[in-house]
């Protein structure tokens, strides 16, 4: 960045996407400040790295800023945004700042409706194992790093490309991965055709020497292939995919498969994350790594040491023979994949699911898809919608969803609004051998942590 930019202020710095960029900028030597409504492990980490954190949004927070960075969740009437405009301080979306970081490196951007965080994490892990030492900006905590960002000394930057508001079009990656294209963020897009058009534009932004890595198993990705004008490779379980997986085996938290490239057997891959959907994510990472000439043996070693990602089928703990697992899945496609992975890996265990819908708009637009997403749950409890800043929509409630799921044939479905009553209900329902899975992008993970404490206390009493 131009030398006169010294102090960078983030509105909503505690968000997982914002904090990663802030951490890299701190490590680059910039003065970073930011505001958020409350403290967290993320804000504490940024403070320990030298960031200045304000709690609450106030005009004076931007007084010394040279640029203000906002996420799509921050509105124009935010007092810090208003003040920045009054002071003629540039206000830019987070994707524009990420694009500026990517401009300094060769960018590897992972896009897609689902699987971005896991795939980005796999790519980052394997590139690190291969000695490339990439800069990393991930939308989740990489367990092996203990954080979601790292400044590397190598030439590459690995990051997620967020399609939710179209701002990923600001990025100009050298390698672009598209894991899938699905209907989501319909408060921004008019429908699936506009989403597909936007992904095509993203793919075609790579340079002539770049590479697109595309999932052939996804119907919407396959649909847009004739419109891709740049060099690409495909991956999937399909026999037509360039990178293909066979002999997939799922057992507990472990997944293994045999990888092939254009009909040639490469070897076996094993990693500690369940689910056939993660086989696809792994294939994407293999394709990226082999484009960068990382030996397959090194790729195997990288996967063997892959520790997973926070809030992606993450084992929180175990007590009284009950495993407590948390997952970020909040879209019907993600929910079906996660529950399917749980059933495939733990066929003998009863699956007790607590789901917190995320956003009124998403719940409304995908209501019927949600209704059909929970068939692999033995016990399903829904709690109130996490608004994520949205105003309620009349008739769109977790209770209405629970009733519709029940009418669709799901036998054991309960809606509980109050958290204490929810935990009391779980204490009555859970039995040794069960898996308690909290699902959602909001704060439903707190239910799992509370239940772990209660289960351990019950064991000691």
UniProtKB/Swiss-Prot annotation:
Pathway: Cell wall biogenesis; peptidoglycan biosynthesis. The keyword Cell wall biogenesis/degradation applies. It catalyses: UDP-N-acetyl-alpha-D-muramate + L-alanine + ATP = UDP-N-acetyl-alpha-D-muramoyl-L-alanine + ADP + phosphate + H(+). Keywords: ATP-binding, Cell cycle, Cell division, Cell shape, Cell wall biogenesis/degradation, Cytoplasm, Ligase, Nucleotide-binding, Peptidoglycan synthesis. ATP binds at residues 112-118. GO terms for molecular function: ATP binding; UDP-N-acetylmuramate-L-alanine ligase activity. InterPro entries: Mur-like_cat_sf (IPR036565), Mur_ligase_C (IPR004101), Mur_ligase_C_dom_sf (IPR036615), Mur_ligase_cen (IPR013221), Mur_ligase_N (IPR000713), MurCDEF_pg_biosynth (IPR050061), UDP-N-AcMur_Ala_ligase_MurC (IPR005758). It is found in: Cytoplasm. It comes from the Bacteria. Its EC number is 6.3.2.8. It is an enzyme of class 6 (ligase). GO terms for cellular component: cytoplasm. PANTHER family: UDP-N-ACETYLMURAMATE--L-ALANINE LIGASE (PTHR43445:SF3), UDP-N-ACETYLMURAMATE--L-ALANINE LIGASE-RELATED (PTHR43445). Cell wall formation. This is UDP-N-acetylmuramate--L-alanine ligase. It comes from Geobacter sp. (strain M21). The lineage of its organism: Bacteria, Pseudomonadati, Thermodesulfobacteriota, Desulfuromonadia, Geobacterales.
């Amino acid at each position: 960045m131009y030398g006169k930019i010294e102090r960078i202020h983030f509105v909503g710095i505690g968000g997982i996407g914002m904090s990663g960029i802030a951490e890299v900028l701190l490590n680059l030597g910039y003065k970073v400040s930011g505001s958020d409504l409350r403290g967290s492990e993320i804000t504490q980490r940024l403070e320990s790295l030298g960031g200045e954190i304000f709690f609450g949004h106030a005009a004076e927070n931007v007084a010394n800023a040279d640029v203000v960075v906002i996420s799509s969740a921050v509105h124009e009437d935010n007092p810090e945004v208003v003040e920045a405009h009054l002071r003629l301080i540039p206000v830019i979306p987070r994707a524009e700042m990420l694009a500026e970081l990517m401009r300094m490196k060769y960018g590897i951007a992972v896009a897609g409706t689902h699987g971005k965080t896991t795939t980005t994490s796999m790519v980052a892990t394997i590139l690190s194992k291969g000695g490339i030492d990439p800069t990393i900006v991930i939308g989740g905590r990489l367990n092996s790093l203990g954080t979601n960002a790292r400044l590397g000394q190598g030439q590459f930057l690995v990051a997620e490309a967020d399609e939710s508001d179209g701002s990923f079009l600001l990025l100009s990656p050298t390698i672009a991965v598209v894991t899938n294209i699905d209907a989501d963020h319909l408060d921004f897009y008019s429908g699936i055709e506009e989403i597909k058009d936007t992904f095509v534009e993203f793919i075609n932004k790579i340079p002539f020497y770049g590479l697109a890595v595309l999932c052939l198993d996804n119907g919407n990705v396959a649909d847009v292939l004739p419109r891709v004008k740049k060099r690409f490779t495909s991956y999937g379980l399909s026999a037509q995919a360039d990178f293909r997986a066979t002999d997939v085996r799922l057992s507990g938290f472990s997944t293994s498969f045999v990888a092939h490239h254009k009909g040639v057997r490469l070897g076996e891959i094993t990693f500690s994350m369940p689910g056939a959907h993660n086989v696809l994510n792994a294939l994407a990472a293999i394709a990226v790594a082999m484009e960068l000439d990382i030996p397959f043996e090194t790729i195997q070693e990288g996967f063997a040491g892959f520790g997973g990602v926070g809030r992606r089928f993450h084992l929180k703990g175990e007590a009284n023979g009950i495993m407590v697992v948390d997952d970020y899945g909040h879209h019907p496609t993600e929910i079906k994949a996660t529950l399917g992975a749980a059933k495939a890996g733990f066929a003998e265990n009863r699956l007790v699911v607590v789901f917190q819908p995320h956003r009124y708009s998403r719940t409304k637009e995908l209501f019927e898809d949600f209704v059909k997403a929970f068939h692999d749950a033995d016990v399903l409890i829904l709690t109130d919608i996490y608004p994520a800043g949205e105003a309620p929509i009349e008739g769109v409630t977790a209770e209405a969803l629970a009733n519709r799921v029940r009418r669709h044939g799901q036998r054991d479905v309960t809606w509980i609004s109050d958290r204490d009553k929810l935990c009391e209900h779980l204490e009555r329902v859970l039995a040794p051998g069960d898996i308690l899975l909290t699902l959602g992008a909001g704060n439903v993970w707190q239910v799992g942590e509370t239940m772990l404490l209660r289960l351990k206390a019950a064991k000691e009493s």
